[in-house]
A protein has these predicted regions:
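An alpha-helical, amphipathic repeat domain used for nucleic-acid recognition
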Residues: 1-202
Length: 202
């Protein structure tokens, strides 16, 4: 397949036109690496390589754009790319490429998520839910939660702001339910309420 034209469309972006009038969007890096120029003939293997490398380069550029806005897990990035129409295989390849270079760090990202929600006063259950929602594998959850410092002041502050009468069973029940929704276990809730001389009915 003959390359008939190469046109720059924006900084670092090019369009390569083939003799069958197909136009392939690509990057300057791909054109340079594959030594493409008008008049060059590509065999079937060369054309497939060009198309593959172009897709991957464009996917990688979009991934870096997303990562420049905020940190993401590997799965989260893959999903965002495929949701935007990028090929699933290219998205997985790109995420792996970025992870190998330390630009995606699931362990570090998971630890940051855990610290963030712990600091906001959420319990382990809510943190697990957030880790799952962000594509962090279950195999990391316990390690991340074990590393997060336990801070009883958060749950105590929540109780002190809501519980005005430890003897009021209805109030204790509502506070307990709210803490459970925030991700605390019944064991943690019971222990915290004991510090306020309140108990949960079995």
């Amino acid at each position: 397949m003959l390359i008939t034209a190469i046109k720059q469309t924006s900084p670092g972006r090019l369009t390569v036109t083939l003799e069958d009038e197909r136009e392939i969007k690509t990057t300057l890096g791909v054109v340079t690496d594959l030594r493409l120029f008008p008049g060059r003939e590509l065999d079937e293997g060369g054309l497939q390589e060009f198309e593959r490398e172009s897709r991957r380069a464009l996917t990688r550029e979009k991934a870096l754009e997303y990562l420049s806005r905020r940190a993401m897990s590997r799965k989260e990035l893959e999903k965002k790319l495929t949701d935007k129409g990028y090929d699933e295989e290219d998205a997985a390849y790109c995420a792996a490429w970025l992870a190998e270079r330390g630009l995606i760090d699931d362990a570090g990202y998971a630890a940051a998520v855990a610290r963030h929600y712990s600091a906001k006063g959420y319990g382990p259950g809510r943190i697990r839910s957030e880790l799952s929602r962000r594509g962090i594998g279950r195999d990391m959850w316990d390690e991340v939660l074990d590393a997060a410092p336990r801070d009883d002041s958060k749950i105590d502050k929540f109780i002190s702001s809501r519980l005005t009468d430890p003897e009021d069973r209805d109030q204790v029940r509502k506070v307990s339910a709210a803490l459970f929704r925030r991700g605390y276990s019944w064991e943690d809730i019971r222990e915290a309420l004991n510090r306020f001389n309140a108990t949960i009915e079995d």
